[in-house]
C-alpha cells in the first residue's frame, strides 16, 4: 500500500496531467505548437500515471 504523501503526490500529478493535456495524448504529441519541453513534461507525468495505475492493479 502506498504512503498517504505518495498518494497526494500522485493525485497532484494526475490533476496536472489532466489539466495540461486537455486533449488526447496523440493530439499533444502531434501538435506543432507544443514545444519539446512541454512534451517532455507531459510524458513524465504520463509515465507517473502509468506507474500509479500499474501499482493499483497489484
UniProtKB/Swiss-Prot annotation:
Keywords of the record: Cytoplasm, Developmental protein, Nucleus, Phytochrome signaling pathway, Signalosome
GO cellular component, one term: COP9 signalosome
Predominant subcellular localization, coarse grouping: cytoplasm
One GO term (biological process): red, far-red light phototransduction
Localisation per UniProt entry: Cytoplasm; Nucleus
Keyword Cytoplasm attributed: yes
Highest taxon in the source lineage: Eukaryota
Function: Component of the COP9 signalosome complex (CSN), a complex involved in various cellular and developmental processes such as photomorphogenesis and auxin and jasmonate responses. The CSN complex is an essential regulator of the ubiquitin (Ubl) conjugation pathway by mediating the deneddylation of the cullin subunits of SCF-type E3 ligase complexes, leading to decrease the Ubl ligase activity of SCF. It is involved in repression of photomorphogenesis in darkness by regulating the activity of COP1-containing Ubl ligase complexes.
Any further remark recorded for this protein: Although strongly related to metalloprotease proteins, it lacks the JAMM motif that probably constitutes the catalytic center. Its function as protease is therefore unsure.
Family: Belongs to the peptidase M67A family. CSN6 subfamily.
Subunit structure: Component of the CSN complex, probably composed of CSN1, CSN2, CSN3, CSN4, CSN5 (CSN5A or CSN5B), CSN6 (CSN6A or CSN6B), CSN7 and CSN8.
Name of the protein: COP9 signalosome complex subunit 6b
Organism: Brassica oleracea (Wild cabbage)
Amino acid at each position: 500500500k502506498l504512503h498517504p504523501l505518495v498518494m497526494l503526490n500522485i493525485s497532484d500529478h494526475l490533476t496536472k496531467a489532466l489539466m495540461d493535456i486537455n486533449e488526447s495524448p496523440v493530439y499533444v504529441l502531434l501538435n506543432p505548437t507544443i514545444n519539446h519541453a512541454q512534451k517532455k513534461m507531459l510524458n513524465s507525468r504520463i509515465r507517473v500515471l502509468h506507474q500509479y495505475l500499474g501499482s493499483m492493479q497489484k
